[in-house]
Curated annotation (Swiss-Prot):
Species annotation: Pyrobaculum calidifontis (strain DSM 21063 / JCM 11548 / VA1)
Protein name: TATA-box-binding protein
InterPro entries: TBP (IPR000814), TBP_archaea (IPR033711), TBP_CS (IPR030491), TBP_dom_sf (IPR012295)
Keyword Repeat attributed: yes
Gene3D superfamilies reported in the protein's UniProt record: TATA-Binding Protein (3.30.310.10)
Family, per entry: Belongs to the TBP family.
Gene giving rise to this polypeptide: tbp
CDD domains cross-referenced by the UniProt entry: TBP_archaea
Pfam family, one: TBP
Keywords from the UniProt entry: DNA-binding, Repeat, Transcription, Transcription regulation
Length: 199
C-alpha cells in the first residue's frame, strides 16, 4: 500500500491589522493612483498589491483587513509594503503594526478515499447530510478548525489561526480516519501533485 500521506495548500489568509493611527482616506485616495475609494458604496479604501498578490481594505479608524496571502511570510511582507506605501503618501503609520490572523483557508488531499457514511458516526462533532451537501463537516476541537471532507479524499480546512494549525489539523485528521478504518489508501497514490507542506 502507498503511504503518500496527506498534502495541503494554503489558499487564503485573512488578517486584521491595527495601524495605530486615524487615516485621511480622501487625501490618500487622491495621492494613490491605484486606490479604489467610493465612500457612498463602501467606507474603506481598497488597495491591491501584485507582489505578493494581496488586497487590503483600509478604514479611517486605522483598521486594515488583508486577504489573499498564501503564507504568513507573504502577509508580513505585504503589511510592510502597505505601511511604506501609506507613509510615502502622507500617512504616519508606525512601521510595526499589530497583525492578527483571523482565518486561514487551505485545500488538501488525503490521497485516499473516505467512507463518509461510517466516518460521521465515529468522529465527534461531525455532520453529514449528502442530500444537502456532498461533504462531511467536521469540527475539530484542537486545533479549533472546521474541515470539509469529501469521499474522494479532498478536504477544505477553515478557521485556522496559523500555518502550524493547518499542518497539525490535516495530519491529525488523516491519522484519526486511518485509525478508525474509514480511509481507503490506494496503491501508487494519486497523480495530482499539490504543494506538500512540511508537517
Amino acid at each position: 500500500m502507498s503511504s503518500k500521506g496527506p498534502s495541503y495548500r494554503i489558499e487564503n489568509i485573512v488578517a486584521t491589522v491595527n495601524l495605530g493611527v486615524e487615516l485621511d482616506l480622501e487625501s490618500l485616495a487622491e495621492r494613490l493612483p491605484m486606490a479604489e475609494y467610493n465612500p457612498d458604496q463602501f467606507p474603506g479604501l481598497i488597495l491591491r498589491l501584485t507582489k505578493p498578490r494581496i488586497s487590503a481594505l483600509i478604514f479611517r479608524t486605522g483598521k486594515m483587513v488583508c486577504t489573499g496571502a498564501k503564507n504568513e511570510e507573504d502577509l508580513k511582507n505585504a503589511v510592510r509594503a502597505l505601511v511604506k506605501l501609506l507613509n510615502d503618501h502622507g500617512a504616519e503609520v508606525p512601521f510595526d503594526p499589530e497583525v492578527q490572523i483571523q482565518n486561514i483557508v487551505a485545500s488538501g488531499n488525503l490521497h485516499a478515499e473516505v467512507d463518509l457514511e461510517q466516518a460521521v458516526f465515529m468522529l465527534e462533532n461531525a455532520m453529514y447530510e449528502p442530500e444537502q451537501f456532498p461533504g462531511l463537516i467536521y469540527r475539530m476541537s484542537s486545533p479549533r478548525v472546521v474541515i470539509l471532507i469529501f469521499g474522494s479524499g479532498k478536504i477544505v480546512c477553515t478557521g485556522a489561526k496559523s500555518e502550524k494549525d493547518v499542518a497539525t489539523a490535516v495530519q491529525k485528521l488523516y491519522n484519526q480516519l486511518k485509525e478508525l478504518g474509514v480511509l481507503y489508501i490506494e496503491e501508487g497514490g494519486g497523480e495530482e501533485e499539490e504543494e506538500e507542506e512540511e508537517m
